[in-house]
Swiss-Prot record:
Residues 1-31 are annotated as: Dimerization. The gene is hnf1a-a. This is Hepatocyte nuclear factor 1-alpha-A. Transcriptional activator that regulates the tissue specific expression of multiple genes, especially in pancreas and liver. Binds to the hepatocyte specific promoter element HP1. Binds to the inverted palindrome 5'-GTTAATNATTAAC-3'. Keywords: Activator, DNA-binding, Homeobox, Nucleus, Transcription, Transcription regulation. GO terms for biological process: insulin secretion; liver development; pancreas development; positive regulation of DNA-templated transcription; regulation of transcription by RNA polymerase II. Belongs to the HNF1 homeobox family. Residues 57-81, 321-343 are annotated as: Disordered. It comes from Xenopus laevis. Protein expressed in liver, stomach, small intestine, colon and kidney. Not expressed in spleen, lung, blood, heart muscle, skeletal muscle, testis and brain. InterPro entries: HD (IPR001356), HNF-1 (IPR039066), HNF-1_N (IPR006899), HNF-1_POU (IPR044869), HNF1_dimer_N_dom_sf (IPR023219), HNF1a_C (IPR006898), HNF1b_C (IPR006897), HNF_P1 (IPR044866). The keyword Cytoplasm does not apply. A motif (Nuclear localization signal) lies at residues 200-208. It is found in: Nucleus. Residues 448-453 are annotated as: Not present in other members of the HNF1 family.
Length: 605
């Protein structure tokens, strides 16, 4: 027989034997249980239990019992179920039937009954708070009993089962009788007078969305965040139908849902709350993002110690097209992966994933917008920052470069023309080697006559379209320029209108040639520059006795109008005095204009 008992039943049997009950008494109680008849004691006498008077002992344990200190209630006092007073309002037949059902549930496995009660609560969306207020049970104890099967005293289980049976009868009446069709109305019988209404006002049951209705509403929210009145009414019918099917009743009996009946107002409020939550989450995310921007420190070039170079590592894709192009930024849209383009100018933007790796934002490398172009002082060179970036454009080949440096290679240069004076970033890169970045002031005013020759525009546009598709970063850099920005190929490097076009300069070098560059001393030479029209085909070269001077091929002009006939070029020669290495440009020059020519040449270092 012991093998047929569950664990809880064996524990209960062991507790009965330890309480002093003999086996013979248990057998006699089991034999007399079927023939037991309830005494004709008025239900009003139940309140005599509080006065300590003798009463008939019931086999289900509802009578007075002597419990140990460990079995005492959570409040430290004897537990008197308030639900028992509700039996007074029932007719004798209903009260007897309910007691019989409760007695049968007490004889079953408590864990099995607890799962039945929990399933019923979930099916009808009944909160545990309602059970606690009606039965007087402890919220934590009830939750543990329903979820984990924690043992509960017989009196408390009897109170729980009494509420469970009464709630089943109440809900059945709501779905059966048509007079109980108004949502939120309590179950009031004809024989209940106003005097019998309990003096304690019970809190109204709060409406709770069921899982079936929530699934329907979330699917509708994905389609339309602000539905119309007709759409909300259709959702009401769909939700009530799902709630009825969840409870196992016909959808035509939706009014029997009582306080759980879905209405159009509740659907409207649900959608309004979802929109508010979405807006709040968006605002919270933006506040967090802006807070990180304001709290993040910004490193400038002069904050870094001399002699050390800090930069970003970038693994460049070998398949990247390194052909140079010249284009208008308006003709090529920015790729969607890098939109919006102003995110590159954010000092706290995250690494942007591209095909070759993670590309750091431009303005995280140098303070581009804080450079005053009117101050031609040496202090501006301190804004130069070394970093490793991928090549944006190639404007030179190994064969076209001079022997000034020991490690020649393809270099990159971003050149732009602006219709208004502004500072924009200029990137010079040598593959994955060391790169110098500094802002360049584009102050040349473009005239309508200063346009490219029509014969050169068509092949340039075609070359731009093919290159932009393979190099998305360059398209984004084009948006950083003005609408008149132009990117130029090395054989077609423009001869600009004045020697003051670039009031700031750029220096690019390879890591292996950094020591060579810093050990060079400047020497100034005046070289005549022949000014020809745009259609001049022959090219001239700058010749010098020193082999370290680069050859500068004559390039096309932006305008057929001759402008400047001569200017100054500064070339570096090797020197054995590398003491002054604090800046890339020599401190002996108090202006940067002396380093600028009307012709722009780029060399690999």
């Amino acid at each position: 027989m012991a093998s047929q008992l569950s664990y809880l039943q064996r524990e209960l049997l062991q507790a009965l034997l330890e309480s002093g009950v003999t086996k013979e008494a248990l057998k006699k109680a089991l034999a007399d249980g079927d023939d037991y008849t309830y005494p004709n004691v008025p239900l009003d006498d139940i309140r005599n239990l509080d006065e300590g008077e003798n009463c008939v002992q019931l086999p289900n344990g509802l009578g007075e019992s002597h419990i140990s200190e460990d079995e005492s209630s959570d409040d430290g006092e004897d537990f008197t179920p308030p639900i028992m007073k509700e039996l007074e309002r029932l007719s004798p037949e209903e009260a007897a039937h309910q007691k019989a059902v409760v007695e049968r549930l007490l004889q079953e496995d408590s864990w099995h009954v607890a799962k039945l009660v929990k399933s019923y609560l979930q099916q009808h969306n009944i909160p545990q708070r309602e059970v606690v207020e009606t039965t007087g049970l402890n919220q934590s104890h009830l939750s543990q009993h329903l979820n984990k099967g924690t043992p509960m005293k017989t009196q408390k289980r009897a109170a729980l089962y009494t509420w469970y049976v009464g709630k089943q009868r109440e809900i059945a009446r709501l779905f059966t009788f048509t007079e109980f069709t108004h949502a939120g109305q309590g179950l009031i019988t004809d024989d209940m007078s106003c005097d019998e209404v309990p003096t304690k006002k019970m809190r109204r049951n709060r409406f709770k969305w069921g899982p079936a209705s929530q699934q329907i509403l979330f699917q509708a929210y994905e389609r339309q965040k602000n539905p119309s009145k007709e759409e909300r009414e259709a959702l009401v019918e769909e939700c009530n139908r799902a709630e009825c099917l969840q409870r196992g009743v016909s959808p035509s009996q939706a009014q029997g849902l009582g306080s759980n009946l879905v209405t159009e107002v509740r659907v409207y409020n649900w959608f309004a709350n979802r929109r508010k939550e979405e807006a709040f989450r968006h605002k919270l995310a933006m506040d967090t993002y802006n807070g990180q921007q304001n709290s993040a420190p910004t490193l400038s070039a002069h904050d870094l110690p001399h002699g050390k170079t800090y930069g970003f590592r970038y693994i460049q894709d070998s398949s990247t097209d390194r052909s140079a192009v010249m284009a208008n930024s308006q003709s090529t849209p920015s790729p969607s992966a890098l939109e919006p383009s102003h995110s590159l100018m954010n000092s706290d933007s995250k690494m942007i994933p591209v095909s070759g790796g993670s590309l750091p934002p431009v303005s995280t490398l140098t303070a581009l917008h804080n450079v005053d172009h009117s101050q031609h002082t040496l202090g501006q060179t301190q804004n130069l920052i070394m970093a490793s970036l991928p090549s944006v454009m190639t404007i030179g080949t190994d064969t076209a470069l001079g022997p000034a440096f020991s490690n020649p290679g393809s270099s990159t240069l971003v050149i732009g023309l602006a219709s208004q004076t502004q500072s924009v970033p200029v990137i010079n890169s040598v593959g994955s080697s060391l790169t110098t970045l500094q802002s360049v002031q584009f102050s040349q005013q473009l005239h309508p006559s200063h346009q490219l020759h029509p014969s050169h525009q068509q092949p340039i546009v075609q070359q731009v379209q093919s290159h932009m598709a393979q190099n998305p970063f360059m398209a984004t850099m084009a948006q950083l320029q003005s609408p008149h920005a132009i990117y130029s190929h090395k054989p077609d490097v423009a001869q600009y209108a004045s020697a003051g076009f670039f009031p700031q300069t750029m220096v690019i070098t390879d890591t292996s040639n950094l020591g060579t560059l810093t050990s060079l001393t400047p020497s100034k030479q005046v070289v005549p520059l022949h000014t020809t029209a745009h259609g001049d085909a022959p090219g001239s070269q700058l010749q010098n006795q020193d082999s370290s001077i680069l050859h500068l091929p004559l390039c096309h002009r932006l305008s057929p109008i001759p402008t400047v006939s001569s200017a100054s070029l500064v070339h570096y020669h090797n020197s054995s005095s590398p003491e002054n290495h604090s800046h890339l440009l020599s401190p002996s020059h108090n202006t940067i204009d002396s380093f600028i020519s009307t012709q722009m040449a780029s060399s690999s270092q």
